[in-house]
Amino acid sequence: MVRKHGWQLPAHTLQVIAITVFCLLVVAFYAFFAPFVGGRIWEYVLIGVYSPVAILVFVLYVRCTAINPADPRIMSIFDTGVNGDGMVRGLSRNYDETGSQLQASPSVVSRSSTVAGNSSVKGSVEDAQRVESVSRRSCYNPLAVFCYVFVVEDCRKKEGPAEEQGNSEEALFCTLCNCEVRKFSKHCRSCDKCVDCFDHHCKWLNNCVGRKNYVTFVSLMSASLLWLIIEAAVGIAVIVRVFVNKQTMETEIVNRLGNSFSRAPLAAVVGLCTAVAIFACFPLGELLFFHMLLIKKGITTYEYVVAMRAMSEAPDGASVDEEIQNVLYSPTGSATTGFSGGSSLGLPYRGVWCTPPRVFDNQDEVIPHLDPCMVPSTVDPDAPGSEKGTKALKRPVKRNAWKLAKLDPNEAARAAARARASSSVLRPIDNRHLPDNDLSSIGTVSIISSVSTDANVAASKEIRNNDLRSSLSRNSFAPSQGSRDEYDTGSHGMSNLSSPSHVHESVTLAPLPQNPTIVGNRFTATSHHMHSTFDDKVLHRGNDADPLFLFAPATSHLRDVRKTSVVWDPEAGRYVSAPVTTTSEVRNRLLNPSSQTASTQNPRPILPAHDSSSGSSALRDPLPLHQAERRLTYTGDSIFYGGPLINIPTRDTPRSGRGLVRDVQDRLASTVHRDARIRRDSTSNQLPVFAPGGLGANSQTGSNIK
């Protein structure tokens, strides 16, 4: 429930105690203190001094409790003439609509901001007119004028146009109030509203202390301290007279209070009230001195609490800035957990196989164990206290004037700014339309750089895939799903293009060549996407060459990254890891297909070489069925079933050839589920290749799984 002021029910226990003690002390002063000071003159003087102070304390307390310290931009919630629920729903609806427009097209940012600005101006004008009409009607009511003295906010220096413009640019959006608030506003959990320049929530007032009532609060503390000092001083004087002038006091007690009241009860009542006043002076005086230091340093109680909490959680001898830097590398820091693997920031980890996600706790790598229980990725099971499953609650920060005197106000302001930036309730007004995931994962990376990075990564993957397709058009072997050699040696093939380190390498790209050096020979590019079940979703490209297939000049800045692939070695009688040709070798092979011969050191079966004049026709000729079966099936001893895959024919393949290849694919698909097994060779430390086997009547699997 949103609380408008401190007098709104339910009342806090400390508020009731404060009001009760004030009333008892005032009654005790007029009944037991002033009449027994000594003479009528002293009595009238003390009453004349005490009464204004007590009235001032009463007025200031009522005023400080009755003032609504809420942010000016949410004051319409407390207007009785407006339906608060409807306004909140309208704000939420506008917030969602504007957010959806921003997500749909970045080009509408300026237009939506202009519309939002016009609507906010219109709403502010309507609110001002409504408040003015209400104030005019209340001017004719004397009781309303009297109450206005207690509820009007403090007179503070008005902000100039430059400051107002700066506050509007640095405004925040409260997700609980569904409204834009000022930069230094904070949402109070007790009052359930955003308080302008939040200082603290006072339980004795049952109200928040902010910009609108801070002057009244300081004045209340000063007046209360003076009132308690007068109360305690007069009480001490009365107690002294009770024990010094016994006969005189007995006569005065009988004259003022009657025969039923003696000297002992008077001493007890005066002594109790005096003790309460004295004991109340010390914490109140400390609080007033504490706020004097806050005013001198130019910070608020909230900033002091945030700074002290950061210093208490920091290691010994570390400042607030060093503690925050350590938090950035902790598992709970949003700056560390928000970075994605596809960013261009160079993550300090490489692709892993089947290990849990790595977490960096104070720059030390922590790998959680794979326990049966559910363990969050940001929690170290080996850390002490992790068995509780929840983080210990933050200890309350005690008020210490000595620590405040030594505190640097700049550090306190920076700590408060970081606390506001990391708040899940208050969001920057420029980013309030972004989804929560974007806000937590982008971090300090700008949106423009993220978009450009994603575009570079996509272009890099397309270029690498095209290079591999061009090289595989002359080779009947396809790269495997991955090998452990790639991970150990750091080389990356087609299988680990999505690893973080590989993505980082492929982010920096040179611009694509505009004028190719050789345009005489054009090749038909074939793009195919095959799943593990060999479905028939085959995509063919046209005869025209794609711009990504054009040959780059000799001064191209594209890096020739070494890639590996699993191929069959007839001499060794097993599959081995061999480097895939680089982009320059692919260009030479495509330009001079007749010069390519089988290597004796690393024999790799390739398509028969043809001259350049008949190269395109050779590509269009389909392979006979018996040759396809021979190439797809290995009949010797092997640790795997089957052999490499057959290449997908080009678009110009005749209909009869496509039918033969389709039959081969259907037979391969029926064999995969029957004979495919996933095992690992402990001798060669080689990962399995997911390739079909057992094709044909004469094929022999004959492999012994180790």
UniProtKB/Swiss-Prot annotation:
**Pfam families recorded for this chain?**
DHHC
Q: Does the keyword Lipoprotein apply?
A: yes
> Per UniProt, what is the membrane topology?
Multi-pass membrane protein
Active-site residue numbers: C202 (s-palmitoyl cysteine intermediate)
Q: Where is the DHHC domain?
A: 172-222
Gene Ontology MF terms: protein-cysteine S-palmitoyltransferase activity
Cellular component GO terms, alphabetical: cytoplasmic vesicle membrane; plasma membrane
Tell me, what does this protein do in biology? Palmitoyl acyltransferase.
Record comment regarding domains: The DHHC domain is required for palmitoyltransferase activity.
Know the name of this protein?
Probable protein S-acyltransferase 20
Q: Gene of origin?
A: PAT20
